[in-house]
């Protein structure tokens, strides 16, 4: 690169806005300029825009990249996020970046996310656009446009009986310019009952059924499905002892041993499209032991 100079000019536009312009001179490699603008609309909304132009003399390339971040927390637990990343040359990070992880990255992603939360469940939607940093002309890169999901956190279903439930539901629409694309719906309901055995041991059996539906839009109009049964049983206990400190205050020591058995039935997957890790899982027949120690203090 030769002799390098970076000179920045900071402009405090207002209490809620600022901007920075920087000259980036790298001797034999070339020169460029980058601009950053930050804004703070309120405690619930802010963002940042950063862009760079660099004339690379060594590789005869005009490089331009862009980063945009925005966050807004709306009333009633509604949240929105935008994370946009773009480069016009696939080797820009290898040529200009000093961040090792950025220099070796294969893909760069942009996302937009919107979620609505309640006490024990959430509804969300997001889109994901990816660039292949080894070949920007790659038309087989998978794009998620969009994903819609719903998640029910562990919740007691009836007051009169100790029956609990959880649910995860997603719908994805996958697109490629070339290659396999389509849609996928995935639903995983679960039910479990904690059963106290004497006063020291609790056994919790859980059963869930996972149903996945596929529509291969470009290759076939026929839908395919996959079903899988999941079962687990956990036996756990909790030992608690409280200690008083000489100077006042107390601390509590908790020991929580547990044993969990999990079984996931095998499923036919030969005819299932592959978009990401959700589409492939292996049979599970697993026994897990755990021992958790917790210390908490009251001063």
Residues covered by each model-derived region:
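Outer-membrane beta-barrel proteins and related beta-barrel translocases across Gram-negative bacteria
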Residues: 1-299
């Amino acid at each position: 690169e030769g002799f390098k100079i970076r000179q920045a000019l900071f402009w405090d536009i207002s209490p809620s806005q600022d901007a920075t312009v920087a000259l980036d001179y790298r001797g034999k490699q070339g020169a460029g300029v980058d601009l950053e603008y930050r804004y703070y609309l309120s405690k619930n909304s802010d963002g940042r825009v950063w862009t760079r132009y660099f004339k690379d003399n060594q590789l005869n390339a005009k490089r331009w990249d862009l980063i945009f971040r925005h966050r807004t927390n709306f009333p009633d637990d509604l949240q929105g996020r935008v994370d946009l990343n773009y480069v016009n040359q696939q080797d820009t990070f290898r040529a200009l970046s000093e961040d090792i992880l950025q220099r070796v990255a294969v893909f760069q992603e942009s996302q937009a996310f919107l979620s609505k939360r309640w006490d024990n469940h959430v509804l969300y939607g997001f889109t994901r656009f990816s660039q292949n940093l080894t070949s920007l002309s790659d038309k087989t890169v998978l794009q998620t446009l969009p994903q819609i999901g719903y998640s029910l956190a562990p919740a007691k279903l009836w007051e009169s009986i100790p029956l609990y439930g959880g649910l995860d539901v997603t719908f994805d629409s996958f697109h490629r310019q070339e290659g396999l694309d389509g849609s996928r719906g995935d639903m995983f309901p679960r039910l479990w009952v904690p059963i106290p055995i004497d006063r020291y041991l609790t056994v919790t059996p859980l059963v869930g059924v996972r149903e996945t539906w596929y529509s291969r839009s470009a290759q076939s109009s026929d839908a395919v499905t996959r079903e899988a049964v999941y079962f687990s049983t956990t036996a756990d206990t909790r030992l608690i002892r409280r200690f008083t400190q000489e100077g006042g205050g107390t601390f509590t020591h908790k020991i929580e041993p547990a044993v969990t058995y999990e079984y996931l039935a095998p499923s036919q997957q030969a005819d299932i499209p592959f978009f990401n890790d959700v589409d492939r899982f292996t049979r599970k027949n697993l026994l897990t032991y755990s021992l958790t120690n917790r210390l908490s203090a009251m001063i």
